[in-house]
Regions:
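Acidic, glycine-rich active-site loops and adjacent beta-strand->loop/helix elements
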Residues: 81-85, 121-129, 134, 139-140
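Short helix-loop-beta-strand segments that form the rim/entrance of peptidase-like active sites
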Residues: 108-128
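Glycine-rich phosphate-binding loop signature in dinucleotide/nucleotide-binding domains
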Residues: 142-144
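Conserved small/polar residues in nucleotide/adenosyl-binding loops
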Residues: 146-148
Length: 148
């Protein structure tokens, strides 16, 4: 079976639960640096797939990371989850976060075959809060070949 087919088949299995994650986030928006319930929810979801979630991390109370694979170039997928004041997830972070999680989980079973590592990086305060800058300054992107 090709990598593409294997990836797609696994995402098909995850489809319902990923939609549930997106819906939950949409219904429970939290502002920059206040994403306590959202980060806890996402961490609990990810623990089903790997118990090695680091939370909190990088000097941010609502940041997390989980890495799949042991060797090879590191791909970092940012999971953004803050909302905007008064309009919630009009920016679509519920969808962006879910897509990043889906991509990371889809690659989880392929990391050894592809010779890579994949890190899902919980990225709070993206909407004007400078969360990515804080993550960068605290080493979250060190050794990454690609960060998306």
């Amino acid at each position: 079976m090709s990598f593409k087919v294997e990836f797609k088949n696994y995402l098909d299995e995850l489809h319902k639960s990923l939609c549930d994650v997106s819906d939950w986030m949409y219904e429970n928006p939290e502002l920059s640096f206040e994403e306590f319930e959202t980060s806890k929810y996402l961490v609990e979801y990810l623990k089903k797939y790997n118990s090695d979630v680091v939370y909190p991390t990088h000097n941010l109370d609502t940041a997390f990371e989980i890495t799949f694979g042991k060797d090879g170039p590191l791909v970092v997928l940012c999971v953004e989850y803050d909302a905007l004041p008064e309009i919630g997830h009009a920016c679509g972070h519920n969808i962006i976060a879910t897509c990043s999680i889906g991509a990371g989980l889809g690659l989880r079973n392929l990391v050894d075959k592809l010779g890579i590592r994949v890190k899902l990086l919980g990225t709070p305060a993206e909407e004007g809060g400078g969360g990515k800058i804080i993550l960068l300054e605290n080493g979250a992107f060190e050794l990454s070949l690609i960060h998306i």
